[in-house]
């Protein structure tokens, strides 16, 4: 198994196991970025609707992989090499490392830009959403900026200056928030279709990377002015430096980007299987009858089948081939044949329905991804604190930190997952009034179960990496991602499941990853944490909390529901739903906090990982 040496840390009189210095700055910046992202995605979904949401996410998923690469392995590699050279007083080595890294990122970024801009239609086709092409093109320039940002952030972090990285990330997120939402809103008001509004929202991302890059360049030159004069050290050969960068970056990048890669594959697969089921198995139409008008699809299928040659099966493979031929003919400026016209019309209709369905699923994913924001501070702190304990040969201390990280994660993940499971539909009605809550609500409830697994998995990955086993999380994610793809390929195509089966892949994927991570930790980590005490109390408190939330919402909805003027069953208004949801969450939080304190589910060691943890421990009398 691949290992790296845990870096040593000087205590300097500071207490271990706390958020301090650079880790605290990075954690705070990451948390702010996640919060800004929440305030961005929720109104965006309501502005561009389900189809625009699908187009946005299909384009953004491609960018997310590149974003993960830029904020994971590459900056870490540059910062490590720069930090080592800087500690040795080798300023020429620092400059050579940065120059080579910047050159590498510019080359890769330019190649990615060319592919995304000129092959946007092909990439959108691979995602089974041709309307995502404008968004992919709008996002293409950001790839070049992302590469430059990676080099500059790594250089800054290598000098132990984390502030520029955090500030640039916040600038990027704020531009995305204000410019992206403004453009999307303006385009919708101008009568532009959802895919163009989605492209406008994505333009905010691109502008954000440009502004963040300008800030990082200014910070870089200001830092250079404060550096001492010339250095006489001889830098290493360029080839050796490049090999060092790749040696460090590749394992971390693969581990961090695996989730994004699986997401891209899975998004394409889910939409493709939805379209296939709609065409080949009309029995699945019953799943969506309440919010999808199938008359245009039925008409398009009938017209297309009449144009098929005798003996040709009416399958998705045949339709896709004919639609591709039609699009190629249009690109070449040639006239379409009648079968090509029929195939293109049917393919467009199928794609429109799948965009609506996937857009609702994406809105559920938006909420499902929010709990991971709270994991950022924990995952960032685990690696340096565990590594520092190991460098001091304090295995008992490292084990305590790992156990505390798992316990804090469980204390956060279990109630959030249970809350989403119990209140999935009401939360969708509150946050996304334009979405179909009868679709997105059950999807969110099912995804709530996966929330627990993914949060715990992220912290387990950090623990394994802190102990030096950087390749194990990659192997685990490959297995989990393969299971997710296999599951969704088969489940989504079932007429009785359809897109409602998509969350099953998340549950099985991250459930398997968590199980394997816990088994690996028990095998390769000395003094492994005891899992039953870590998970039992948070689970018990969360289960009782979930029952309380369910009861409060149910009682409130009965009291606040009223019959419509024309008669009929009682209906809960939007305001009434908001009151019930917020009331249920408030009661649930109070119940959970009381149970956590009563069960002694958190210890002083756990609180020591948090800012002001000592004061909180004294308040709870721990």
What do the predicted segments below correspond to?
Residues 45-65, 194-203, 240-248, 271-368, ...:
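Interfacial/gating helices of multi-pass transporter permease domains
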Residues 72-87, 364, 375-392:
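Helix-loop junctions and terminal segments of transmembrane helices
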Residues 2-5, 553-622:
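Membrane-proximal transmembrane or re-entrant/amphipathic helices at the cytosolic face
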Residues 33, 41, 75-76, 138-158, ...:
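Short runs within selected transmembrane alpha-helices of multi-pass transporters and secretion channels
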Residues 121-139, 341, 350, 355, ...:
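Interfacial segments at transmembrane-helix termini and the short loops linking adjacent helices
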Residues 2-4, 17-76, 106, 113, ...:
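Signature of the first transmembrane helix
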Residues 1-36, 92, 96, 233-252, ...:
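N-terminal membrane topogenesis motif
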Residues 2-15, 194-202, 217-256, 283-290, ...:
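Interhelical loop/hinge segments that connect adjacent transmembrane helices in multipass membrane
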